């Protein structure tokens, strides 16, 4: 449809130009004919249009008739040209109006579509529908969408994250907007000159604003030359009705400056009063001066940093804020938008926030705990050796090892060395009832040198004292009473019986005392052979006679003494006297009874 309109427009332009050229040609021919000298008398046909009422010559009348016909023809041509120009202007105006209406409808549709994306109320949709120009639609759309974005951020909805991630940086967005607007303006100007789609495609494929403007200037310049060459009055009127390109560019720059200024004010939550001042500014310079004054009056901001330690996102970012609380809100929203949930810390000295993402919570039943190798050293009575086990901790390993020891009949004292992860069990000695114990014993020997009993015997005892008691009981039981000696080296006791001789009295046998303690069975003494005993006694007596005589002589000269230094003879005599007195007393008592 668009292409068909352009073709019709081009045909109308061509027809208009052709008519103009024809009219000019006719006028020129007429002027040439009038100015040329008349050499031949023209022949006036019968029935000529002019008569000779004024007495003019026939030649003059013929010329005047020809001039009249030429004038009529010229007037008709001019009338046709004017009518064609008027029709062409009306068609061009209608086409321009239709194109503007289409552009306005498209802009409204785009704005309403974006409003629906942000859930904008019907109030703002009605404002869009009532807008009269594309520029008005776009300005209102930019303001409403920006406010909607802020509202969505404050609500912290889940859909905000996806939307923000899909947005391009502000600088790129501005460049993209400028490039798109430059292309629209360029195509609009190319449409004015009926430029072909080939050149429009070149405009649409340009990557920079500068490229668009350069291409636009070249194409428009060529189109202007072509249109001027057509020399149509309608074209001149049309061109005069257009807004100068310089004013159009200034208007675009002013609109862009206002949009950017309002965005900057939105960052700081500036009221609508200052935004209205921006929107009412008439020049770009006025907008910039006003935004500088407003920002200078705002509270001073600081740069805050955020360090992200996430599972999948790590890095740093910064923001400008009037205080730490404001920066924290911005950073937490940023972290939430990027799926980072963790522990927050803040260092006021460096104005740095740090968020460390929490580790993923895993079901304990799904965990495979780390294990350690533990060793058991067994020092048992019948089982000795080492074994190992894998366990998550020492307590678990201890239970396993104690069960193992119990299963193998090992019961002892437990120790643990954490440095080497080693348990040691040393088995306890067997507990035996004291009544069942058989103490270690030693063999002791007794040598008896008695008057009637001579020989040796032995006994087993736990110590010398016990053996001495047993030997003395044995000697007493056998009527041996003498001097006792003990050699620890040979574990030998010796008892030498004392000899008591009282003149005039028959020797009396001492009374045996009754045993007061249980007797320990002893090995009977080995009696000495009689012949050998007699020989030994004879030899001893012969050897003792000279010595006895000498001793008797000395004893006669000295008095007997007491104690260990006294002569055994006197000791024995005293004992005999005492025994005799005791026996006599007993006999007397019996007689009295």
Swiss-Prot record:
Question: Where is the protein situated, by its record's location annotation?
Answer: Secreted, Cell wall
Primary localisation category: secreted
Gene3D superfamilies in alphabetical order: 3.10.20.10, Albumin-binding domain
> Annotated Gene Ontology MF terms?
IgG binding
Which PROSITE patterns does this chain map to? GRAM_POS_ANCHORING
Q: Which stretches of the sequence are propeptide?
A: 563-593
According to its record, what are the GO cellular component terms? extracellular region
Composition skew (Basic and acidic residues), residue ranges: 529-557
Positions of region (3 X 37 AA repeats): 104-290
Pentaglycyl murein peptidoglycan amidated threonine PTM positions read 562
Entries under InterPro entries matching the protein: GA-like, Ig/albumin-bd_sf, IgG-bd_B, LPXTG_anchor, M_anchor, YSIRK_signal_dom
Q: How does it sit in the membrane?
A: Peptidoglycan-anchor
Q: Where is the stretch described as Disordered? A: 503-567
Keywords for the protein's UniProt record, in alphabetical order: Cell wall, IgG-binding protein, Peptidoglycan-anchor, Repeat, Secreted, Signal
Annotated sequence repeat ranges:
104-140, 179-215, 254-290, 303-357, 373-427
What span is annotated as the signal peptide, if there is one?
1-33
Q: Where is this motif: LPXTG sorting signal?
A: 559-563
Top-level taxon? Bacteria
Region described as 2 X 55 AA repeats: spans on this chain:
303-427
Region 5 X 5 AA repeats of [DE]-D-A-K-K: what ranges?
531-555
> This protein is called what?
Immunoglobulin G-binding protein G
Q: Which organism is it from?
A: Streptococcus sp. group G
């Amino acid at each position: 449809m668009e292409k068909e309109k352009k073709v019709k427009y081009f045909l109308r332009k061509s027809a208009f130009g052709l008519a103009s050229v024809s009219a000019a040609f006719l006028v020129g021919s007429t002027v040439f004919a009038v100015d040329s000298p008349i050499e031949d008398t023209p022949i006036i046909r019968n029935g000529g249009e002019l008569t000779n009422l004024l007495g003019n010559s026939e030649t003059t009348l013929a010329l005047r008739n020809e001039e009249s016909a030429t004038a009529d023809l010229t007037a008709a041509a001019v009338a046709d040209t004017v009518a064609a120009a008027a029709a062409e202007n009306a068609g061009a105006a209608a086409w321009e109006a239709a194109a503007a209406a289409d552009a306005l409808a498209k802009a409204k549709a785009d704005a309403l579509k974006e409003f629906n994306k942000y859930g904008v109320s019907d109030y703002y949709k009605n404002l869009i529908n009532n807008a009269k120009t594309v520029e008005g639609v776009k300005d209102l759309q930019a303001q409403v969408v920006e406010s909607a974005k802020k509202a969505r951020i404050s609500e912290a909805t889940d859909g905000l994250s996806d939307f923000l991630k899909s947005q391009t940086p502000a600088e790129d967005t501005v460049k993209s907007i400028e490039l798109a607007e430059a292309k629209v303006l360029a195509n609009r100007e190319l449409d004015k000159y009926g430029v072909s789609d080939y050149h429009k495609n070149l405009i649409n494929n340009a990557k920079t604003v500068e490229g668009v403007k350069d291409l636009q200037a070249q194409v428009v310049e060529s189109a202007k030359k072509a249109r001027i060459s057509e020399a149509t009055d309608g074209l001149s009127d049309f061109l005069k009705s257009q807004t100068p390109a310089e004013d159009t560019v200034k208007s675009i720059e002013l609109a862009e400056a206002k949009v950017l200024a309002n965005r900057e004010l939105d960052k700081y939550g500036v009221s609508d009063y200052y935004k209205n001042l921006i929107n009412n500014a008439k020049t770009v310079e006025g907008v910039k001066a006003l935004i500088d004054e407003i920002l200078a009056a705002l509270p001073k901001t600081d740069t805050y940093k955020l360090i992200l330690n996430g599972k999948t996102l790590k890095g740093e970012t910064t923001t400008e804020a009037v205080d730490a609380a404001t920066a924290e809100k911005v950073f937490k929203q940023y972290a939430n938008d990027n799926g980072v949930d963790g522990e927050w810390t803040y260092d006021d000295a460096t104005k740095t926030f740090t968020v460390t993402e929490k580790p993923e919570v895993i079901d304990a039943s799904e965990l495979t705990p780390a294990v350690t190798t533990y060793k058991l050293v067994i020092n048992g009575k019948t089982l000795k050796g080492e074994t190992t086990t894998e366990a998550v901790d020492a307590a678990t390993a201890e239970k396993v090892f104690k069960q193992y020891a119990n299963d193998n009949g090992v019961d002892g004292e437990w120790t643990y060395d954490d440095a080497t992860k080693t348990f040691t069990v040393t088995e306890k000695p067997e507990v035996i009832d004291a009544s069942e114990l058989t103490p270690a014993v030693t063999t002791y020997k007794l040598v008896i040198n008695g008057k009637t009993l001579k020989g040796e015997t032995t006994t087993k005892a736990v110590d010398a004292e016990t053996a001495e008691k047993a030997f003395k009981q044995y000697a007493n039981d056998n009527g041996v009473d003498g001097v006792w000696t003990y050699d620890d080296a040979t574990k030998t006791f010796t008892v030498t019986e004392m000899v008591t001789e009282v003149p005039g009295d028959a020797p009396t046998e001492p009374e045996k005392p009754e045993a007061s303690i249980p007797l320990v069975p002893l090995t009977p003494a080995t009696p000495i052979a009689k012949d050998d005993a007699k020989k030994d006694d004879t030899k001893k007596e012969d050897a003792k006679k000279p010595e006895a005589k000498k001793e008797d002589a000395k004893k006669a000269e000295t008095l007997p003494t007491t104690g260990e230094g006294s002569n055994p003879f006197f000791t024995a005599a005293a004992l005999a006297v005492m025994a005799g007195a005791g026996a006599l007393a007993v006999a007397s008592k019996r007689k009295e009874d």
